[in-house]
Structures are given as C-alpha cells and as structure tokens.
Amino acid sequence: NFRAYSNEYIKQYQAICSEIDVVAKPYCKELNSNFKGNKISAYCKCITDIYLDFANRRVNLQEREISKFPWKNWSYTTELQSNGKEKVISNNPDWWQTYNKIKHNRTTVSNEMQLPYYKLANQKNVLHSLAALFQLELYYFRTLQQTYFPTDTDMPDSPSKLFTLKIGGILGLYWIVA
C-alpha cells in the first residue's frame, strides 16, 4: 500500500513537512546561536556539520520489519556567488523534493512518472517524512536534554508507539520518544 494516495495523505504530508521546517529552524539556532537560515539547505549545513552521521541514521518502524533512512543522501555543497557570499546547495531526500513538487505544482503531471504530483502524496512519502520528523525531533530533544538537564539520563519518559532510533556512539542507548 505504499503507493496509495489520498487527499488525507496530502494534508498529512504537508503538515509533517511544514513541521520539519518549523522544528529545524530553532534546532539549528540551539546548535549555533549565530544561525540565521530559513531553508532546508541551511538546516542541512548546520545539522550535518555537527552530526556527521545524521543522514545515515536508521529509523525503525516498531512491530514491522521496516527500516527507513529518512535523511539518506542529505548533504550539501557550497559555491561562491559573484557578490562574494557563500551559497549552500543541498541534496535533499526524495520525500522532501516530492513535498515541494506537491506544494507548488500539485496538479502538474510529472514527465518522469506520467502522474500528477498530488498522487505522490502517498503512504510511502508520508511514512518517510514522519520518520524524518521523528529523527529531527529526537536529536533536538537530546540536544536540549544535554544542554539544560545533563544529569537527567531518564529522558524521555514515554516510548514511541511507532518508531525507534538507535543513537550509538553518543549515548549508546535506544532513545524512544512518543
């Protein structure tokens, strides 16, 4: 059913990806107090410069044998513009690129797939984007915990009913967030 699409999936997909945008900005500001970006490329640079393995993290869907790498291939390059400023260009996950096509060109027919973009608001992309939001929020939560509550190692209190993410090498535990 990964290809199943609906109007409800469009709403969920847009809400999830919008929330990624909303969460990423203050998270990057928490990581770098001088952060001023507001685009996915700026978030990519900020997060992956600190967490080199962020894009390689696997999120597991509980009660199913499904693993997702929601930020797979998330990387960036920089180029110097004629005005002397650095421009960050990111290679974004497929689900983010699809989200933007649905957001801006919903009824346009994809040359590649011969489908209108809204039909790509499917179960697969909703699940990938939700796993990406889970990972982003988990990293943000961990950063806040380490900064403001470093002695409280019992956080979070409630496990997620949907996802798990192992963050090895830093804490060596399974962090599970509701």
Locations of the language-model features?
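Acidic, Ser/Thr-rich low-complexity intrinsically disordered segments
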Residues: 158-178
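Charged alpha-helical initiation segments
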Residues: 1-15
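Secondary-structure edge/capping motif, primarily at the C-terminal ends of alpha-helices
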Residues: 1-2, 30, 106, 140
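OB-fold ssDNA-binding interfaces and closely related basic DNA-contact patches used
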Residues: 9, 20-25, 148
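Substrate-binding/catalytic groove segments of enzymes
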Residues: 94, 103-116, 137-148
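Amphipathic, Lys/Arg-enriched alpha-helical patches that create a basic surface
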Residues: 118-163
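Short non-catalytic regulatory patches outside canonical folded cores
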Residues: 21-97, 104-109
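Aromatic- and histidine-enriched alpha-helix N-cap/loop-to-helix transition segments
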Residues: 11-18, 94, 121-128
